[in-house]
Amino acid sequence: MSSFVTNGYLSVTLEPHELTLDIKTNIRNAVYKTYLHREISGKMAKKIEIREDVELPLGEIVNNSVVINVPCVITYAYYHVGDIVRGTLNIEDESNVTIQCGDLICKLSRDSGTVSFSDSKYCFFRNGNAYDNGSEVTAVLMEAQQGIESSFVFLANIVDS
């Protein structure tokens, strides 16, 4: 995983009942709820600091809500194709094999190996190596996929040990 820090404006929408004396708290909560730990366009905001030293630009009324661009210092995280990651192998059935790596989900394609069911548990076979469901494996990221809520998703292949 790689990361970078940038200054930018994050756009949030506030409802009329949120425009009270607690507006700073409501803005902070809206920014965190909308952007923090959410995968958007291949990157995820891991840390957000709202800049108090910069004035807020005027809001815009859109459909009975107020859209505000909030000045922030944002630390983003992202993964590259070719990154090597380690995680837990999760086999739900023959067609759903994933590796869970914290904020990353690696999907294994059918041609990555074969799934077998023996002794009341699933096993994944690749190049003569057997990997039990729940075992720690290493994978190389092959292709980025559409993220899910708060996770990156990549197609990956297991690296043979």
Swiss-Prot record:
Gene Ontology cellular component annotations, sorted alphabetically: DNA-directed RNA polymerase complex; virion component
Source superkingdom: Viruses
Biological processes, Gene Ontology terms: viral transcription
Protein location: Virion
A single GO molecular function term of this UniProt record: DNA-directed RNA polymerase activity
Record-listed E.C. numbers: 2.7.7.6
Primary location: virion
Keywords: DNA-directed RNA polymerase, Early protein, Nucleotidyltransferase, Transcription, Transferase, Virion
Induction: Expressed in the early phase of the viral replicative cycle.
Enzymatic reactions: RNA(n) + a ribonucleoside 5'-triphosphate = RNA(n+1) + diphosphate
Function comment: Part of the DNA-dependent RNA polymerase which catalyzes the transcription of viral DNA into RNA using the four ribonucleoside triphosphates as substrates. Responsible for the transcription of early, intermediate and late genes. DNA-dependent RNA polymerase associates with the early transcription factor (ETF), itself composed of OPG118 and OPG133, thereby allowing the early genes transcription. Late transcription, and probably also intermediate transcription, require newly synthesized RNA polymerase.
Name of protein: DNA-directed RNA polymerase 18 kDa subunit
Organism: Vaccinia virus (strain Copenhagen)
